[in-house]
A protein has these predicted regions:
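Acidic/histidine-rich catalytic neighborhood
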Residues: 2-58
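Active-site core of glycosidic bond-cleaving carbohydrate-active enzymes
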Residues: 39-209
Length: 210
């Protein structure tokens, strides 16, 4: 939380905190110098600060708790273009030229849960974003954990049929060996990919309430 609070850049004119360039977002297909306010990082920073503020308050660190909560409440809004969430505020072509790798827009609500994660998400825009990802994203470029991320996004919207479809979809990196480990079968140098297993387990726990 100390790092996040220090890393964010305050704009006194708008009274918001931004993630400024250069930065490499979770979708590592963007030039660091062009990336500003990546959507997942905005949501995750806010999420982390709110958790830290709660813990700090409970431990008696009230000054830190107040500071972190205030920053969380003034983090830049999630970037939107044409009624869908986009990768970052300088990426209006998210769904044309950048529809590859991790669909980080879906992580802001599907993966994050509680601690006000839902407060900054417009459910209609989020649903539009999910459907846009399913429609245009290059699934061959997804990683093993992305399929469960998409499934969790669908589940949060009450679309469990789509969630299960995404968990079971036939795609090069949504593959499992006899041991149960996720593998990226298009990568000879990556026989096992444990983030895929972690994501699958989290999605299953959410969807089946276990």
């Amino acid at each position: 939380a100390v790092f996040i609070a220090d890393y964010l850049v305050y704009d006194p004119m708008s009274d918001i905190y931004n993630i400024e360039a250069p930065v490499i977002p979770v979708q590592e297909r963007h030039l660091p110098e062009d990336t500003r306010n990546p959507i997942f990082e905005l949501a995750y920073f806010r999420y982390g600060l709110l958790i830290a503020a709660k813990w700090a308050y409970e431990l008696g660190f009230t000054d830190e708790a107040s500071q972190w909560h205030n920053i969380a409440m003034h983090i830049a809004p999630l970037p939107i273009n044409d009624d869908v969430y986009i990768a970052h505020s300088n990426c209006p072509d998210t769904f044309t030229n950048k529809a590859i790798d991790h669909p980080l827009m879906l992580q802001i609500y599907g993966m994050l849960d509680g601690y006000g994660a839902e407060d900054i998400v417009d459910k209609d825009i989020y649903r539009n974003t999910l459907m846009k990802v399913i429609d245009v994203w290059d699934y061959s470029t997804l990683w093993g954990w992305d399929f469960a991320v998409i499934a969790m996004a669908a589940h949060k919207l009450g679309l469990d049929d789509i969630a299960l479809e995404q968990l079971l979809i036939n795609s090069p990196k949504n593959d499992y060996v006899e041991s149960g480990n996720n593998r990226q079968n298009s990568r000879k140098d990556l026989p096992l990919y444990l983030p895929g297993n972690g994501s699958l387990l989290l999605a299953a726990a959410r969807i089946f309430n276990i």
